[in-house]
Swiss-Prot record:
Interacts with FtsZ. InterPro entries: Cell_div_suppressor_SulA, P-loop_NTPase, SulA_CellDiv_inhibitor, SulA_enterobact. The gene is sulA. The keyword Ribonucleoprotein does not apply. Keywords: Cell cycle, Cell division, DNA damage, Septation, SOS response. Belongs to the SulA family. The record marks H169 as: Essential for degradation by Lon protease. Residues 106-112 are annotated as: FtsZ binding. GO terms for biological process: division septum assembly; DNA repair; negative regulation of cell division; SOS response. The keyword Acetylation does not apply. Is rapidly cleaved and degraded by the Lon protease once DNA damage is repaired. Residues 162-169 are annotated as: Lon protease binding. This is Cell division inhibitor SulA. Induction: By DNA damage, as part of the SOS response.
Length: 169
């Protein structure tokens, strides 16, 4: 999982996570948009990273909005995750072409502490700017969830450093 280059060009995930936590606890007037790319075969990693933040945001008086393409949140999962059942709203069966527009409208209202939407395609620069403006206006956070399959993840070149040493040869 990583946060988008749009949202955090010069920072690591840990500093981005601490910034998110600081923003949510200080209730500053800045909004935040972040893209979360995760492997479809490892959804627990995403839950482990996002749940503490969502639990903290659940303590605010505002709603949490989930814009899901097909999945329906289970009442049992919401409760077991420690999220406030009375503050979680979901709109499912939303067409991907309406997700960004719906996120912008929801973020702008200020009624939601967080708006989470699923998109398969990358955002355009214009869409990203619209989301950032809306999040700032509504003092809210928005997460673009982008699943990737394990097979497409495996075909990309891995980033890393090879250290060649003649000490071991």
């Amino acid at each position: 999982m990583y946060t988008s280059g749009y949202a955090h060009r010069d920072s690591s995930f840990s500093s981005a996570a601490s910034k998110i936590a600081r923003v949510s606890t200080e209730n500053t007037t800045a909004g935040l948009i972040s893209e979360v790319v995760y492997r479809e075969d490892q959804p627990m990693m995403t839950q482990l990273l996002l749940l503490p933040l969502l639990q903290q945001l659940g303590q605010q008086s505002r709603w949490q909005l989930w814009l899901t393409p097909q999945q329906k949140l289970s009442r049992e999962w919401v409760q077991a995750s420690g999220l406030p059942l009375t503050k979680v709203m979901q709109i499912s069966q939303l067409s991907p072409c309406h997700t960004v527009e719906s996120m912008v409208r929801a973020l702008r209202t200020g009624n939601y502490s967080v708006v989470i939407g699923w998109l398969a395609d990358d955002l355009t620069a214009e869409e990203h700017a619209e989301l950032v403006d809306a999040a700032n206006e509504g003092n809210a956070m928005g997460f673009i969830m982008r699943p990737v399959s394990a097979s497409s993840h495996a075909t990309r070149q891995l980033s890393g450093l090879k250290i060649h040493s003649n000490l071991y040869h």
